[in-house]
Amino acid sequence: MGDPAGIGPEICLRALREPSVLKMCTPVLFGDAGVLARLKSPSKNKTKVISLAEWKDTRRIEAPLIIDCAAIDAKKVRPGKVSAACGRAGYLYIEHAICAAMGKKISAVVTAPIHKEALQLSGIKFPGHTEIFTALTRAKRSCMMLYSDKLTVSMVTTHIGYRDVPGKLSVARVLDVIELTAEAMRWALHREPRIGVCGLNPHAGEHGLFGGQEEENFVKPAVARARQKSINVTGPLVPDAAFTTNQRMKFDAIVTLYHDQGHIPFKMLAFDTGVNITLGLPMIRTSVDHGTAFDIAWQGKADQTSLFSAIQVAVGMAAGKGQK
């Protein structure tokens, strides 16, 4: 359900009653029934509300469910306001959903947005969803991918300050993300994908002239190793030119080295329809590609398009793995 004070609850409620969603899957919403009731937007179908205890004893899921996690006092939730209580609740919903997926009770997890400041205030030190899923599933390697029919990007680093990015780069890490990206796009396209890899510095370093030799030390060796593994990859690309129409059409996905290098062009092209996918997990996880939107929370103004796209992608991935 995401942060209770954000737009997550209302867009999740829409998913529970959306005919196109119900044709694709049987949704199970981990959240708080009290919060959802405050929205005064009841589902038109026969959505059942059960407790966590009842959920643990549930063997068959035959209709949409709301799992009442009782993680927060609904009366104390203030729409659009950051709070430790909401941060903790958002985390607990994720934790319960991961347990369900790892236990094979559900086929995939689709997440609504959490608020990173609220998460930190609650004492939970993960900077975001990607890091939570990686840690709780004990994934050996993972990365964030933003997927759409207009542009697909993946990130070598995510929720860290720009000054910390160079220290997090290594040949092994860049290669991991190239491999994860190629594997995902191979599955999506049913052919060998074309992968581009951005440089870090202006002009991709100009052969070491700008920056700290990151392209020479990390990107070029990783690209060379990926080619040895028969991956169709090109890089380092000049970052400011990589996302022009002519350049991006040469690639099925582009590996970027830090958060905003990938997020800015992606959101300019696919803000409403983009899907966040965590690659490398032992389970399927997709997400909306937007935040909690506190400025419009609980006002009926939120757009659910990204959530519905994330559900559609998750269903497709589950079907590809032979799950129902």
Annotate each language-model stretch with its function.
Residues 131-140, 160-186:
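Active-site glycine-rich loop that binds ribose-phosphate moieties when present
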Residues 1-129, 172-257, 261-276, 281-284, ...:
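Contiguous, glycine/small-aliphatic-enriched amphipathic segments in soluble metabolic enzymes
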Residues 135-151, 281-295:
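Short, flexible loop segments at boundaries between secondary-structure elements
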